[in-house]
Amino acid sequence: MNQYQRQETMNKVNRALQRARDTKSLIIGRGVVSRSAEMFLELFAGCKAVIVADENTWQVAGADVKESLDSSGIVSEQPYVFPARDFYAHWQHIESLKSYLESKDAIAIAVGSGVINDTVKLVSHMLGRRYMCVGTAASMDGFTAYGASITKDGNKQTFDCPAPLGFIMDSEIAAAAPKELAASGYADLIAKIPAGADWMLADAVGSEKIDSFAWELVQDGLKDALSIRLRFLPVTYP
């Protein structure tokens, strides 16, 4: 991506933030995990913080977020760190995190990817709070999406809850994540093709009118994004 393309992308992002209902601040770039305190002060001045991560995401970014908070004088509670083994978006983790956070007068900072983000998203909503997220992998496209996908009673369900008020993605951390996570994110990009077709059909039958701004934001750069060869993935043929 050249300088012009980067500027065009950021212009689109800024316009999207102006229209967004939930997310109001976004920082993406190299080394920006160090700006976690900056965003927290912008969005939650005067509040305490509490980092929520798993064992892996704590190592790759959680400790850096904590250092950023400490160096800025932000008071933070003891971080809540899930075990990495067999950790997924299950209701039992919702209950355990809720039990911990409801006794803390603090704003959660989700440090991780889809599972951590959705878990903190729903629990924060249940407690009537907002939160921010620091991403650790480009494994999906729902960091700033409304709703959380959680397994409850044996079924994956989507629960209504607002997106994070702020989101940070450090590109160096994302690039260093396991390659299968990037492949998962690439699959989410591919899903934009049938999603676009669904929206066209919904518009045609009068169910959901296409919003031209949202359409262009998602679809205009999709072909270029999908044309990037995933050189780090082995290709095998039968």
Give the ranges of each region predicted by the language model.
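Solvent-exposed alpha-helices and their adjacent loops that cap or buttress functional pockets
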Residues: 18-20, 43-44, 100-103, 124, ...
